[in-house]
């Protein structure tokens, strides 16, 4: 069973990385500005999904723990990218794009916290809804 978790995380990681790459290319087709919108949007979606997953899906035992780990660590872990965020910020600073770099860092941190909060709130709301309907966690 221990080997299975590595396979699940690996496959989910491949799918997350491919999803990030495809979504990044798609956003770049429509966004031709200095601000790194693709990475920001991908990371914000990832913050929401991880918070929702760990709050709702994991507590409801809807999926086996191995699948939840695969989605959280594998898919969402490879879908989001702190390293790209960091490199893009340094590139903006090196090109003297100070205001864009500040906006990017601010939106990433505050937006990530807000999206995580929304994901948690949605998960918590859905759990309470199921409990009031008589369902069990």
UniProtKB/Swiss-Prot annotation:
Superkingdom of origin organism: Bacteria
Catalytic activity: fluoride(in) = fluoride(out)
Keyword tRNA processing: no
NCBIfam families registered for this protein in UniProt: crcB
Protein name from the UniProt record: Fluoride-specific ion channel FluC 1
HAMAP family attached to this UniProt entry: FluC
Chain segments annotated as transmembrane: 4-24, 37-57, 62-82, 100-120
Main location, first listed in the record: membrane
Gene: fluC1
Bilayer disposition of the protein: Multi-pass membrane protein
């Amino acid at each position: 069973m221990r080997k299975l978790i590595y396979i699940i995380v690996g496959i989910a990681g491949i799918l997350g990385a491919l999803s990030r790459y495809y979504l990044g290319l798609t956003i770049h087709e429509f966004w031709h500005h200095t601000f790194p919108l693709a990475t920001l949007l991908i990371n914000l979606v990832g913050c929401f999904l991880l918070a929702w997953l760990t709050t709702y899906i994991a507590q409801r035992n809807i999926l086996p723990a191995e699948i939840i780990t695969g989605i959280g660590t594998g898919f969402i872990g490879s879908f989001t990218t702190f390293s790209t965020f960091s490199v893009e910020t340094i590139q903006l600073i090196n090109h003297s794009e100070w205001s864009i770099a500040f906006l990017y860092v601010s939106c990433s941190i505050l937006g990530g916290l807000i999206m995580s909060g929304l994901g948690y709130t949605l998960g918590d709301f859905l759990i309470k809804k199921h409990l009031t309907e008589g369902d069990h966690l």
